Each structure stands twice: as structure tokens, then as C-alpha cells.
């Protein structure tokens, strides 16, 4: 078989792992026969090379390949792995605009600014000679030709052109949503490979969600008002002053300014603002004040809705009548070299509410209005087009459910075994733990259970919580009680609410270096890779069932109604399994997967929430989410068992 010889030629290491070879051959077979495929390849299989070598094989035979993943770090790793394999293909790496510097205004690039800035000197166009005098390079797009200057064209546009011309394109899921049509301007995509595919559904849902948050544009209006205010007024303005807008209104009316017509008098020539009726700075202030009244009115309407209750689309009659506002914000961000267009984004999102269909659910969350798609499978089917689609992940869980939710009709499945020894990991479910369902949970008892488990592990441990409230409760208890225990390494590391990616990475590195106990929420756990004795215990406080938002309730209701129409028994239970349970199970599998990252790792996973021992673990096994076995023990049994188990492997 030609492809087997190709594997030997391309594989960069002395030996191909058997599961890895199975993965390559199955991907090859499915692409050749134009069949979609979902692969669950646990950590250690060598998943990345498992799909890159088939991708190269077909790309070298004139098939165009798109590789998707979730984060820029993962994109970089895939791009570097591709570069390390011998080939003569064009490979492109496309990130979102915010990762580039805008040459036109300085600062981070912005999608909306780029759309509005039609006269931008740094984008490709139909002129063959650049303003700098350089002869531009042509790009043939079917019956159309555009030209770009290799010296002046902005880096995003260069990356986009490279993606249009490339044989293999690497991008994240959000860019797939926004830019797939653009990169097919010259050639269609034949093969789509999605790595970390368990994140695809939520990524596309988040990208297509409309968020109406009046706080951001109102805050932007305040800073704009201070910027354009005359010096005598500027001295009286303070962002935190509750009379901020009243001061501006009194100032304008005292000078005979008709606030209602200011927005109609503004003229913007692309570079400067002016007014045909008033002094420019006063007309601009009047237009800003008018915009505040309109947006504040929308804010008050939003706050009148009950939180976390679905809103009828007929009640979403919002409108902003202020054409000058976009020009003023463009002028402001250009002068201040800012990147975000909060007002323009707000106006665009208000307009987008008109086009939502029955698939969207709208509700208030905090001060914001969320408009989320219930199902994203139809979005994804459109994006897939006629391509063969391959989904890969270490933890997909229920493959049939994943196929249904991500629009992969008639997909084939491949589940690979972990190459790591199973006897080095033990999953323990406490039968006398606390039932952590919100209205029943006993936080004090759960805290005591967690400390006893940590004392039994007596090694570097990660404790995962459903909420920061639970984390904080245990942190206070642990600080008070840890000195009374025999835990050798008493260092405590805490993942705090609001930490950004950089801070979370530093926390993880500090824990790896110093060791001890790391307290975090489930969100922190996904993607965290801590091999060796740096992590020998994962303790899960509570099962990560999601809060029943209007999105989940609507999804569950629709599915239940469909099951009843089809005469399916236990329709409510089936709908629950496909919604709340599915989200919980996929997250829990990710949590469990934090422990064993290499073949020499060992340790225990202890699930404190007794619902796992009572019924959740059994259902997860039956439905294919959990591939590992687990043992049900009492807390006393676990405390005796864990030290004996750990002693077999400790250095």
C-alpha cells in the first residue's frame, strides 16, 4: 500500500506507535472514500502526527487542507510540527485581526474598523502600483485580480493572501466561522481536520452569540466626552461623578445648543470632524450626550427583564438614531490609537437582533442581554461545505452525541486505547461523600472530606471546584487546618477569579516548581499539562453540572418535544442526557484527564461528590463518556487505600 510507505518516509521518529498507525490509516481510508470521521485519541497516542501525515499526503496530491484548533498556542505547535516534516507545500497560519497591528491607525487591528476604512492604503486593491512606488504582486482570484505591495500591505492582509494561496491553512475555530469563505476565494477546501474537536460546538456558539452590554459603550462615551470637551468644562468632569452627564447638559444648554439636532450637524471627511451649525467641539458633545440618552434607555429596558428568563423576540425593539456616532468614535480611536470600537460593535449587535430566528434564545445575564444559538449543527454544516471532515480529540466522550451536535452526518468512529499502563492510575468514587447538588450540599462536611483525601495522597495535588464560592470556603478551611496535618508540602496555590491567561500560566508554573496543593475551578483544568510527580493527585469536589440557563432549558425542551413526537420512552430523561448531562460529562472527563500525561506518571483521582458513586459514573460508562474503570469506596477505605497505592510508584 502506497500510503504505508509514505508513513515510513515521513515519520520523524524511529518507531510509529500502533494506535497512531491505526489513526493514520483510518484517516487515509475515510478521506479517500469521502467519509467523515471522529477519532478519540487519548494523550500519548501521538494525535497531532496522526492527522498531519495523512494531511500532507493528500495536500501533495492537490487536495486543499484546513486544520482547526482552539488556541493560538495550539496553532503555533501544529504549524511548527508541519514545518518539521519534509514537504514543498505552501502552509499558512491565520489568526484573528486583533493579533495584528493596524498600520492605518496604530494599535491593535479591529474587524469593524477594517470594514469601514475603505480608503486604507495598506490593503490589497485593483491598482498595480503602490503609493510607495513599488510594483505590486498580483493575486488571481478566478476572474478577478487584486494587487498587494510586499512592503506596505498590513500583516493581516498578507496572512490572508497567504491563506488564499496555501495548500494547508492552520486557523482557530473562530476564524473558521469568520474567514472560511474568504480563504476559498481561489480554491475550495477539500479536507477539514479539527483538533481539540470537543471544543468546536462551544467555540462556534460563542462566536455566533450576540451580546448587548450597554456598560461598555456608555463608558466609552464618557471618555469621548472628556476628550472633546472644552478645557473649562474638562476640569469639571470626573468619570466617577454620578452627575457627569447632567454637568455636560447644563453646559450645552447654557450656550444655546439644541442637543436634539447636534448629531445632524456633524460632518466627517475621513480625517476631521466639523459642524455646519455649531462650534465643532460643542456639536460633538451634544451628539455624544444624545447617544448616552439612547443607550441608557436601552440599558434600563434590559434591566427591566428578569435575569435568566427567556425573552420574547417581540420585546427586543431597540434602536439607535445617531449617524454621527460612528464618525465620532472613528475620529476618537484614531487620535487615541485605540483598537476597540465599543459603540460601533454595540450598534451592529443591536441591528443583528433583527435577523435572529427561532434557533436563538435571548435572556438577561447581569447587565447584558445574551442572544445564543441553541443548536450550531446547521452553522457547521454550511461551513463544512463539500469537504471531508475529520474530528480529533483526546476526550470527545460520547461520539454519537458529538456527531449530532457538530453536524457530522453519517460519520465513522475510531476510539483508540491509551498507550499508558492502566495500573498506574486509580479513579475512586466516594460513596459517603457529600451530595453536592446545590440545595442539598453540606460545605463543611465536604471541606473535611477534601482535607482527609489530601492528607492520604500527601503529594502534589490539584483540587477542582465548580464555583469560586466553594473554592474560597475550602481555602479558608485549609489555611486554618493544614498545620495540624501530616501533609509534607504545605504550599497552597490558588486560582483566583478574573485571572487572565498569562496569570494562570504563571500560577501553573509556580505550582510545578514549588509543589503543594493547587486549588482551582474546572475551567482552569482544561488544557493544563503537569507531568511526573509534579501532580500525583486530582480531587474533584463537585460534579460540574451547568447552571440551567435559558439556553439549556430551551435546548432540553426542544429535544424532549422531538422525542415525544417520535414516541420515545423517557423523553425528559433522554433530553437531560443530551444537554446538562452531556456538558457535565465532557467537563468531568477533562478534569480526570489532567492526571496521567506521560507513560511514567501515576496517581489517584478522587471524586468527592457522592452522585458520581450513586449513578453518574454508571451512566457515563454506559453512554461512552468514561472509558476508564473506577472503584467505589467509603472515605475511610479510601484513606487507607491511597497511601498503599501511591507507595508502589513513588521514587
Swiss-Prot record:
UniProt-recorded name of the protein: Probable ATP-dependent helicase MJ0942
Disulfide bonds: none
One Pfam family named in its UniProt record: Helicase_C_2
Additional remark text: The fourth ligand for the [4Fe-4S] cluster could be Cys-130; Cys-132 or Cys-152.
Signal peptide: none
Reaction catalyzed: Couples ATP hydrolysis with the unwinding of duplex DNA at the replication fork by translocating in the 5'-3' direction. This creates two antiparallel DNA single strands (ssDNA). The leading ssDNA polymer is the template for DNA polymerase III holoenzyme which synthesizes a continuous strand; ATP + H2O = ADP + phosphate + H(+)
The Helicase C-terminal domain, residue ranges: 449-638
UniProt KW keywords: ATP-binding, DNA-binding, Helicase, Hydrolase, Iron, Iron-sulfur, Isomerase, Metal-binding, Nucleotide-binding
Annotated binding of [4Fe-4S] cluster, by residue: 102, 149, 154
Domain Helicase ATP-binding, first and last residues per copy: 6-255
Cofactor(s) in the UniProt record: [4Fe-4S] cluster
Gene Ontology MF terms: ATP binding; ATP hydrolysis activity; DNA binding; DNA helicase activity; iron-sulfur cluster binding; metal ion binding
Amino acid at each position: 500500500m502506497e500510503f504505508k510507505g509514505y508513513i515510513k518516509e515521513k515519520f520523524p521518529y524511529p518507531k510509529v506507535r500502533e494506535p497512531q498507525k491505526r489513526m493514520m490509516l483510518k484517516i487515509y481510508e475515510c478521506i479517500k472514500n469521502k467519509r467523515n470521521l471522529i477519532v478519540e485519541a487519548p494523550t500519548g497516542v501521538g494525535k497531532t502526527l496522526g492527522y498531519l501525515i495523512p494531511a500532507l499526503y493528500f495536500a501533495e496530491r492537490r487536495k486543499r487542507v484546513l486544520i482547526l484548533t482552539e488556541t493560538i498556542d495550539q496553532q503555533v505547535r501544529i504549524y511548527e510540527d508541519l514545518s518539521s516534516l519534509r514537504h514543498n507545500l505552501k502552509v499558512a497560519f491565520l489568526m484573528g485581526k486583533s493579533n495584528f497591528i493596524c498600520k492605518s491607525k496604530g494599535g491593535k487591528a479591529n474587524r469593524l474598523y477594517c470594514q469601514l476604512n475603505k480608503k486604507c492604503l495598506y490593503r490589497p486593491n485593483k491598482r498595480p502600483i503602490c503609493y510607495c512606488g513599488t510594483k505590486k504582486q498580483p493575486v488571481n482570484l478566478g476572474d478577478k485580480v487584486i494587487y498587494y505591495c510586499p512592503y506596505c500591505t498590513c500583516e493581516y492582509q498578507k496572512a490572508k493572501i497567504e491563506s488564499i494561496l496555501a495548500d494547508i491553512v492552520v486557523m482557530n475555530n473562530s476564524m473558521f466561522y469568520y474567514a472560511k469563505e474568504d480563504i476559498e476565494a481561489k480554491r475550495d477546501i477539500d479536507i477539514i481536520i479539527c483538533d481539540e474537536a470537543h471544543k468546536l460546538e462551544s467555540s462556534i456558539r460563542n462566536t455566533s452569540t450576540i451580546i448587548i452590554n450597554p456598560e461598555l459603550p456608555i463608558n466609552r462615551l464618557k471618555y469621548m466626552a472628556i476628550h472633546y470637551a472644552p478645557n473649562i468644562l474638562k476640569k469639571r468632569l470626573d468619570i466617577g461623578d454620578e452627575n457627569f452627564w447632567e454637568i455636560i447638559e447644563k453646559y450645552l444648554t447654557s450656550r444655546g445648543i439644541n442637543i436634539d439636532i447636534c448629531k445632524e450637524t456633524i460632518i466627517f471627511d475621513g480625517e476631521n470632524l466639523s459642524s455646519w451649525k455649531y462650534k465643532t467641539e460643542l456639536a460633538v458633545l451634544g451628539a455624544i450626550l444624545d447617544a448616552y440618552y439612547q443607550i441608557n434607555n436601552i440599558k434600563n429596558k434590559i434591566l427591566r427583564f428578569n435575569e435568566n428568563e427567556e425573552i420574547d423576540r417581540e420585546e427586543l425593539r431597540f434602536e439607535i438614531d445617531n449617524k454621527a456616532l460612528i464618525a465620532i468614535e472613528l475620529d476618537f480611536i484614531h487620535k487615541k490609537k485605540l483598537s476597540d470600537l465599543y459603540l460601533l460593535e454595540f450598534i451592529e449587535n443591536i441591528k443583528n437582533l433583527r435577523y435572529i430566528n427561532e434557533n436563538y434564545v435571548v435572556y438577561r445575564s447581569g447587565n447584558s442581554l445574551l442572544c445564543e444559538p441553541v443548536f450550531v449543527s446547521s452553522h457547521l454544516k454550511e461551513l463544512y461545505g463539500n469537504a471531508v471532515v475529520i474530528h480529533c480529540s483526546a476526550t470527545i466522550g460520547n461520539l454519537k452525541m458529538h456527531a449530532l451536535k457538530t453536524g457530522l452526518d453519517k460519520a465513522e468512529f475510531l476510539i483508540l486505547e491509551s498507550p499508558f499502563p492502566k495500573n498506574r492510575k486509580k479513579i475512586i468514587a466516594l460513596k459517603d461523600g457529600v451530595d453536592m447538588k446545590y440545595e442539598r450540599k453540606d460545605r463543611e462536611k465536604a471541606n473535611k472530606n477534601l482535607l482527609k483525601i489530601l492528607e492520604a495522597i500527601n503529594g502534589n495535588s490539584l483540587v477542582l471546584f465548580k464555583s469560586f464560592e466553594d473554592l474560597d470556603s475550602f481555602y479558608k478551611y485549609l489555611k486554618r487546618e493544614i498545620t495540624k496535618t501530616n501533609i509534607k508540602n504545605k504550599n497552597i496555590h490558588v486560582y483566583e477569579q478574573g485571572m487572565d491567561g498569562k496569570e494562570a500560566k504563571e500560577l501553573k508554573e509556580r505550582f510545578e516548581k514549588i509543589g503543594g496543593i493547587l486549588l482551582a475551578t474546572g475551567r482552569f483544568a482544561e488544557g493544563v499539562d503537569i507531568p511526573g510527580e509534579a501532580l500525583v493527585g486530582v480531587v474533584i469536589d463537585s460534579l460540574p453540572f451547568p447552571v440551567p440557563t435559558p439556553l439549556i432549558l430551551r435546548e432540553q425542551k426542544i429535544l424532549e418535544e422531538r422525542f415525544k413526537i417520535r414516541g420515545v420512552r423517557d423523553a425528559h430523561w433522554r433530553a437531560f442526557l443530551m444537554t446538562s448531562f452531556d456538558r457535565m460529562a465532557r467537563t468531568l472527563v477533562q478534569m480526570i484527564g489532567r492526571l496521567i500525561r506521560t507513560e511514567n506518571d501515576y496517581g489517584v483521582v478522587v471524586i468527592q461528590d457522592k452522585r458520581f458513586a450513586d449513578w453518574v459514573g454508571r451512566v457515563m460508562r454506559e453512554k461512552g463518556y468514561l472509558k476508564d474503570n473506577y472503584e467505589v469506596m467509603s472515605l475511610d477505605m479510601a484513606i487507607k487505600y491511597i497511601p498503599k497505592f501511591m507507595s508502589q510508584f513513588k521514587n
